[in-house]
C-alpha cells in the first residue's frame, strides 16, 4: 500500500527525479542522511535481503554540512513511523526540511531544520513490522517529496477461546 508522498517542489525545477525503494523484500538496517540548515539534501538505505546487505542508490545531492547514519538493530528493530516538516512555499532549496524516524524501540531525529513556514506530516505504521519501503522525489537542491509503503498484516492472530469459555462458565444467573 503506497502512502504519500508529502512535500513540495519548485515548479521552476527541470530536474525532478522520482525514486522508489518499495520493491525490496527486505528490512532496512541503516539510513544515511545528508542535511544542513536548508533541510534534507539526500537519503540512502541499506537493506538486508536474502541474508546479504544491499545498498540503495543515493536519492539527492551529496551535500549539506551534516551527515548522519541511523543504525537499526536488525532483525529486532524495525520502522514504525516517519514524520517531519516540509516547506510549503516555492524556494530554491530542499522542500523536505526535517525527518524523524520511529522504530519499535527508539526514536531518531529530528534531522534537518524546523520552522514556522513548514507544514508537518506523520506516517504512523502501527506496532508490528508493516513498513515496506520509501519513495519520493529529489532535484539538484535536495529531497522534495517522501512517502512510505505499508505491508498490511496477512496472518490473523490466534484468539485464545479457552479463557472466554472459562469466564462464561462462572456466570451465575438469578
Curated annotation (Swiss-Prot):
<dbReference type="GO" id="GO:0030246">
    <property type="term" value="F:carbohydrate binding"/>
</dbReference>
<keyword id="KW-0963">Cytoplasm</keyword>
<dbReference type="GO" id="GO:0046741">
    <property type="term" value="P:transport of virus in host, tissue to tissue"/>
</dbReference>
<keyword id="KW-0430">Lectin</keyword>
<dbReference type="GO" id="GO:0005737">
    <property type="term" value="C:cytoplasm"/>
</dbReference>
<comment type="subunit">
    <text>Self-interacts. Interacts with RTM3.</text>
</comment>
<dbReference type="InterPro" id="IPR036404">
    <property type="entry name" value="Jacalin-like_lectin_dom_sf"/>
</dbReference>
<keyword id="KW-0611">Plant defense</keyword>
<dbReference type="GO" id="GO:0051607">
    <property type="term" value="P:defense response to virus"/>
</dbReference>
<dbReference type="InterPro" id="IPR001229">
    <property type="entry name" value="Jacalin-like_lectin_dom"/>
</dbReference>
<dbReference type="InterPro" id="IPR033734">
    <property type="entry name" value="Jacalin-like_lectin_dom_plant"/>
</dbReference>
<comment type="similarity">
    <text>Belongs to the jacalin lectin family.</text>
</comment>
<protein>
    <recommendedName>
        <fullName>Protein RESTRICTED TEV MOVEMENT 1</fullName>
    </recommendedName>
</protein>
<dbReference type="Pfam" id="PF01419">
    <property type="entry name" value="Jacalin"/>
</dbReference>
<comment type="function">
    <text>Required for the restriction of long-distance movement of the pathogenic tobacco etch virus (TEV) without causing a hypersensitive response or inducing systemic acquired resistance.</text>
</comment>
<feature type="domain" description="Jacalin-type lectin">
    <location>
        <begin position="1"/>
        <end position="152"/>
    </location>
</feature>
<dbReference type="GO" id="GO:0009615">
    <property type="term" value="P:response to virus"/>
</dbReference>
